[in-house]
Amino acid sequence: MFYEKIQTPAYILEEDKLRKNCELLASVGEKSGAKVLLALKGFAFSGAMKIVGEYLKGCTCSGLWEAKFAKEYMDKEIHTYSPAFKEDEIGEIASLSHHIVFNSLAQFHKFQSKTQKNSLGLRCNVEFSLAPKELYNPCGRYSRLGIRAKDFENVDLNAIEGLHFHALCEESADALEAVLKVFKEKFGKWIGQMKWVNFGGGHHITKKGYDVEKLIALCKNFSDKYGVQVYLEPGEAVGWQTGNLVASVVDIIENEKQIAILDTSSEAHMPDTIIMPYTSEVLNARILATRENEKISDLKENEFAYLLTGNTCLAGDVMGEYAFDKKLKIGDKIVFLDQIHYTIVKNTTFNGIRLPNLMLLDHKNELQMIREFSYKDYSLRN
């Protein structure tokens, strides 16, 4: 397979899989009337932005650099939200963006005069979420993200055209329905004054089993009831199962177990495997145990077990233990599946480890080098 020929580490995005996701997302927009935006925080692959732009209405950004990236690589609708905008950046953000969403009333009042040409919105803290982990719960206790309903009382909203909420993380249409119920209960008296409402991200639309028809109905019914334009801003759903991270075995050592050291890193290249945590699937291998050594399955006859580890000094830079049909050898390729979303955007050069190259497998089944990183990239960051 083509994996054997490439320089590692490398992310390989597959165009056909990306288009399949985008076709589904575009279909949701067409059937529901919602406008679907790409959330760059989860997927910002420069070589694929034009492809995504064929299907989605634009990008949602978290600050100046993402807004500039959206302008450079897609140049469609640009919606920008930040927990706190900076004085020296707001002017350029306003010039790039169509929508600007403020996180607090103080920020809205501070920058209203500098954003008069934009469609302005406020982020709502629904104070309700079904997020699977508190780390990813934007509506939890002491959350800095958004404005509570009680703080909307007696506020002049004449300059505000939209409301934004974000309360989901890799979740279902049922979860959105539950959040919408609370959102309408708490913020219903202001929704009718708006031109648009943004349902945020975290919608696992392209995952197998997601109830797409329910999502369409929720968006359409909401829009019809309140007379507003609905926006969705998936990130992970765009990049979901569209490509992999390819690494090579650099060394194999024995310490009670066979340990393969790879030219990649969970810490630097797959950080969510540590943060969530989760154990990545590997091509042509089975998971035996998680990185915390939690047993998942037993080793079968004629299989070979290896602990896959990263090439950094972090003791816990471990991917997990896996079963292979044959013994690994130095130079073998290890392919971590579904590693395009929330990886590239989070990469670090910890320990001076090489940034994985960015590659695209196009519709002709030809590999294109999108970004080939070098020492200079490390030097410029430090």
UniProtKB/Swiss-Prot annotation:
GO BP term, pick one: spermidine biosynthetic process
Subcellular compartments: Cytoplasm
Function: Catalyzes the decarboxylation of carboxynorspermidine and carboxyspermidine in vitro. In vivo, responsible for synthesizing spermidine, but not sym-norspermidine.
Organism: Campylobacter jejuni subsp. jejuni serotype O:6 (strain 81116 / NCTC 11828)
GO CC term (a single one): cytoplasm
Family listed: Belongs to the Orn/Lys/Arg decarboxylase class-II family. NspC subfamily.
Keywords per UniProt: Cytoplasm, Decarboxylase, Lyase, Polyamine biosynthesis, Pyridoxal phosphate, Spermidine biosynthesis
CDD domains: PLPDE_III_CANSDC
Main location: cytoplasm
Gene3D superfamilies: Alanine racemase, Lyase, Ornithine Decarboxylase, Chain A, domain 1
InterPro entries the UniProt entry points to: Ala_racemase/Decarboxylase_C (IPR009006), De-COase2_C (IPR022643), Nsp_de-COase (IPR005730), PLP-binding_barrel (IPR029066)
Repressor keyword on record: no
Disrupted-gene phenotype: Growth is highly compromised in polyamine auxotrophic bacteria, but can be restored by exogenous spermidine, sym-homospermidine and to a lesser extent by sym-norspermidine.
Pfam families: Orn_DAP_Arg_deC
Oligomeric and partner information: Homodimer.
Needed cofactors: pyridoxal 5'-phosphate
N6-(pyridoxal phosphate)lysine sites (modified residues): K41
Name of the protein this chain belongs to: Carboxynorspermidine/carboxyspermidine decarboxylase
